[in-house]
Amino acid sequence: MKKTLSVILSLILIFSVVNLGGITAFAENETITDGDYSYRLLDDGTYELLSYDGADTDLIIPSEFRGLPVTVLGVYSCGLCDNLTNVVIPDTITSIGSQCFKKNPSLETVTIPQSVKEIGEGAFSECPSLKRINIENLAVWCEINFGDQESNPFCFASEFYLNGKPLKDVEIPSSVKKISNYAFYSAPIETLKIPLGVTEIGIGAFVGCKNLTSISLPSSIKSIDRAAFMECTALTEVTIPKGVEIIDEFAFYKCSGLKKVTVPSSVTSVTISSFNSCTSLEELVVLSEANLEFGDLGSTALTIYAKSGTPTESYAKANNIPFTSLLIGDTDGDGSVGISDLTLVSIYLSGKGELTSAQAACADINEDSTVDAFDMFYIDKAIYA
């Protein structure tokens, strides 16, 4: 009798396990609702948040469901939440879907963890009240795959915080090799220092950074991509380092406060829109002898400085722009390299005088964007050669 009962119980258990397995398999492809949240089990054994239908003002998105991590915020999953003002995203999330937070009219603050690797198109579109963005890791932020400009919350936000501290002066970490497209789109930063090792500034990386007054670029950069610094209206001076080869279209478009630009000898490509509508430009120093297309720069107070006989001289004359010939080492512009040039550099290095952009370009013999004792040595050598 006991043996028969044991067999029956075993059969019941087997059928129960088979039945439960069927339910689990079915659930993997279905929406699971738990209170205000709906989820979907992904192939990798983690969950995607499909929707949030609550009315909270402060939302801390769950980091797990049924003991498994939530790694994806789905398309439009947290949109149309009229009351939502503050969102904290957990450090399990790696992907924020397209239009995830779209049309949240009251949203003011978002905290984004360093686990996030991609943010889809329009993730923060139509969030007009967005004010403050908190991030944890600047290097990771630089490398996030942003779908477009409105996937970056800086499209609307006016305050940038790194680990709870306001960030206005940005120094890119040395581990970064490329600054992603739209990484700092419209960010409220004031100064920018990019270290040696970064090779590319992505499309629209710093578009509309209207408070940005100073940028320091390394010689490791090969390309300044399309619209990288477009509409950075507070920039007044840019020295592009030797090593840059391509300045893509709209790179400095509508930088209306820009007065001085130095283009190094390494540059082989400039488009007609790269510096278009830089209406305050006064000094354009071109050390490159390549055939560069400057287009309509939009300034009436401009003087171009370049070597005689170059395509840049032809461009200046064809467009009735005042032109001054450059001779490397000829800091005082008298047409020869002599003691007076050495004296001028010495006065500058002692802190008792200044150099114009053109003078600095002539004095910076090795084109390292710095006039220093090495340049004095080269000038001295040229004088007594």
How should each PLM-predicted stretch be described?
Residues T4-I23:
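Sec-dependent N-terminal signal peptides of Gram-positive bacterial secreted proteins and lipoproteins
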Residues G22-S38, A55:
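Low-complexity, acidic Ser/Thr/Pro-rich repeat tracts that form intrinsically disordered stalk/linker regions
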Residues V75-S77, G97-C100, G120-A123, D148, ...:
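Consensus positions within tandem repeat domains that build extended binding/scaffold surfaces
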Residues N145-E150, D296, P311-N320:
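Short, aromatic/basic amphipathic alpha-helical patches
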Residues E150-F156:
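Short mixed-charge
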Residues D36, L42-G45, G54-T71, C81-S95, ...:
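Structural signature of tandem-repeat unit edges
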Residues N19-A25, L326-A385:
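Cellulosome-associated attachment modules in secreted, modular CAZymes
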